Amino acid sequence: MEPIWSELQLERMAGRTAAQAFVEGDIPMPAGREVERILQADAQIQNETARCADGRVDVDGTLALQLLCVSTDGIPFDVHASTRYNHTIPVEGAQEGMRAEITPQLMDIRTALDNSNRAHVEAVADMNATVQQDENMRVITDVRNARNLETRYEQAQLARVRPLTGVSLRSREELEAPGVVQVLRVNAAPHIDNVTLEANGAAVEGVMYLYALYLDDEHRLMQAMVRTPFSELIPLEMDVSACSRITAMPSVRDISGNVTTEGEALELNITTQIEVFCITREDVNTLSDAYSADGGVNVERQMVEQLTPVSTVTGLCRIMETLRVPEESPDVARVIFTTARPTVLALTDNSGQLAADGILVTAVVYADAQGNTNVFEEDIPFRCAIDAPFSPDAMVRVRPLEVRGSGVGRSVQVEYLLETQARLFERQQIMLAVDMQETEPAQRENGIYVYMADEGETPWDVGKRYGVTMEQLQEWNPDLGEMFAEGTPVLILSNSGRRR
């Protein structure tokens, strides 16, 4: 008997959990500015490092803030700042040297001014952690020169997310901004609609959603928005023949805005990073179990659990809501701008399809009839359908591309355009044979038996226990199924093994 060995490169899932992190910091206001109030706070959280240790993952990152303030002389201005955080996430099974992926999600943010002209910021974030171990495992794939050996095999699907390339794109866009004198805030949200593989690279098509907040020549707070399509052919120097799916992930690395020399418009300079990935797949047949009729073989087996990447699905979700102005607030004369921060609370099985349920934390900044700037917030429940089958192991992110508000009086109509991105995984458990040894034949009684099977037992279980081949078991029990019900009679003629 000669086992055939092979080495599998596995990504084993060691643990997965979620924890909440509290982030706080003090943000000094610009020198020479006396702040009357903070109108609106926006933030983005980005985890930068994750280090695995025994039973935990240590993470740190940055909370980037944009605070829209009003000075004591009634002039709006924007403050950009950041604060660092570090946190420890308990993860059972984590060990030093393993790899952790952290997906942070901002749940709540609060700001307050103190007497020293500083803003105290408190934020709560969900930290979703997945810990995996890259392991080369030596396994048995088959057996040579074995007599009367029954073997069973499993197909292991080895899939990996493989980075192909990354490119940095610079673009310049112009937004109409009548009467603009000062730029306060600029944001860009790139969305990729389509990625196709061509002979000389990956063709990427999408839309850039641009937004700017500025002051006009009457010191009024104004907003400008535009959508700009883009396309790019990204060269790929690596072999992509093994790729089953190609995905492109965009992110804004830098953005700045200036008033054009002619006035009446804003010039935005954007640097966008696009990372191109693919999923490679390899199906490997491995030995999962074996036995000999005389019981003279011992197989050591090990169960391995993998979280196998399947695909990344990106889509759009459009929502329209009517928001009511709180009783204590004045009527709306003009909506200045509207923001939304999506928070995903649960993944839902929507008739077999994946859906994300959550809250849109919405802020409406508006001017009243006297020209004063006001703000109110409301939490809007949402559900976004995703073009993918339901999977409890999916990692879903929802982000706003564009939020538009309009209306006067006591209500505001808000149109949300959200991007959904679902990374789909398949939880795979593989039984692998990691060792095999010949042993003394088992002692068995000659005779005829009728075995009453337990619920869920298989012919393999019975054959291995009593030392009979699958062919013999089928011959004696012509109506044998793949799995037994409780009390199913199985006829066995035991005539192998070492006799008593």
Q: What do the PLM-derived regions correspond to, one by one?
A:
Residues 1-445:
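Membrane-lipid interaction segments
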Residues 438-475, 480-500:
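Primarily a LysM-type cell-wall glycan-binding module
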